[in-house]
């Protein structure tokens, strides 16, 4: 492989391709003469669209094929939405860079209503996220929540076809695809705690590939890394998967990191919340400490009940 070429493995969805093109442009900006090639591919998560993610293996379904491409030296890096990146990496691969975060909030999208509180009793809301379902059900148990899969365009099409009264999507994805005008209202982190890593793009590569790691270095955003590390540490310590509603969101003011987290029943009947504050350089420890507090407040019973089923 030429020293002036870097190959990006990416999913074929419009949002995944946007992320890959973003990384391509950043690499070309920092490294004159570098050729960046895209290797688009379909993953199991893109193909299995008729079953809720929680029932078919979770978000790891979106990254496995990309990782195989790197291990087989068909690609040098893979670009991921951080909220889709599993906790564990295959031997020889690792998360090298976390880019600057986009808007981490959820977005309320509807053609007839301004926000969740305005929805009439029994309105149908579409989302594939148990985290979103849990928090909506906690505040509006009268709403009917139906699973919603597919890429952003497909989901908007289902809303426009009248299958849903409203749908909930990640604000970052709509902004990146220049679909911000479809956002009826933003849902604050106080109203709906985001998923860990939501809005951030991560770059995975072979851990022994020093050439590629040097090329990627300028794309790292330190503050975003601190925030995402804290969020992922909480999730990892809880051993949380796609079957449990878990939210985590970190903010940094000066050098102080504030991490909020929640664990809930899928039906929204019981939500446990906690907050930890500390130095941003202790992000990992803050995440673990918050997980311990959530467990001590009853999250363990929720996790055990879900995983026994």
Swiss-Prot record:
Residue numbers bearing the S-(dipyrrolylmethanemethyl)cysteine modification: 242
Family the entry assigns: Belongs to the HMBS family.
Protein name: Porphobilinogen deaminase
InterPro entries membership: HemC (IPR000860), Porphobilin_deaminase_cofac_BS (IPR022419), Porphobilin_deaminase_N (IPR022417), Porphobilinogen_deaminase_C (IPR022418), Porphobilinogen_deaminase_C_sf (IPR036803)
Cellular component, GO annotation: cytoplasm
PANTHER family linked: PORPHOBILINOGEN DEAMINASE (PTHR11557:SF0)
Function per UniProt: Tetrapolymerization of the monopyrrole PBG into the hydroxymethylbilane pre-uroporphyrinogen in several discrete steps.
Species this chain originates from: Shewanella sediminis (strain HAW-EB3)
Pathway where it operates: Porphyrin-containing compound metabolism; protoporphyrin-IX biosynthesis; coproporphyrinogen-III from 5-aminolevulinate: step 2/4
Gene this chain is encoded by: hemC
